[in-house]
Amino acid sequence: FVLGEGAGVMVLEEYEHARARGAKIYAELCGFGMSGDAYHMTAPNMDGPRRCMNNALRDAGLNADQIQYVNAHGTSTPLGDKNETEAIKAALGDHAKKVVVNSTKSMTGHLLGGAGGLESVFTVLALHHQKSPPTINIFNQDPECDLDYCANAARDLKISYAVKNNFGFGGTNGTLIFGNTP
């Protein structure tokens, strides 16, 4: 766990309005989910993040097998990373093993309140450029974190839909799903 500083901003507007004004459209916000598990002030619980991802999939009208990429909350803490791995596997089922997951916090540190904005920008750019950013500094991957974490090098990846997870202290969870533009 390393603290960082930064922020990211995106403009959200109706598709027709953006097209009419000639805006460059990077992605579509397809769905979102939230949950609060109030399990512990700092220790995570897998159920809240799982429900959050399921809520986002339902809101987007998608099945788990339509997701290709997850930008994880990924704090690089043993408890947090194991918890999120289990939540991703619970939400995506057997398809989780086919999804590329990364944590951009491995490169930026944890921006706390600024993390969600910047990591959403990274997620949209991954979708736009069809490339998963790496999770750097994975040299001895925890066997309990057994998903494809795109270790140490970016990878070309056909992405139609991407998930962005952010989890906060006290069990506040948020998930966004972005898709290619129509």
Over which residues does each language-model region extend?
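Structural signature of cysteine-dependent C-C bond-forming condensing enzymes
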Residues: 15-27, 51-65, 86-107, 115-169, ...
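Conserved small-residue
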Residues: 11, 29, 67, 72-73, ...
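A short beta-alpha structural unit
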Residues: 32-37, 69-77, 104-111
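Short glycine/threonine-rich loop-to-helix capping motif typified by GTGT followed
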Residues: 38-49, 75-92, 111-118
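Short beta-strand scaffold segments in enzyme catalytic cores
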Residues: 8-11, 173-177
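Condensing-enzyme catalytic core mediating Claisen C-C bond formation in acyl metabolism
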Residues: 1-62, 69
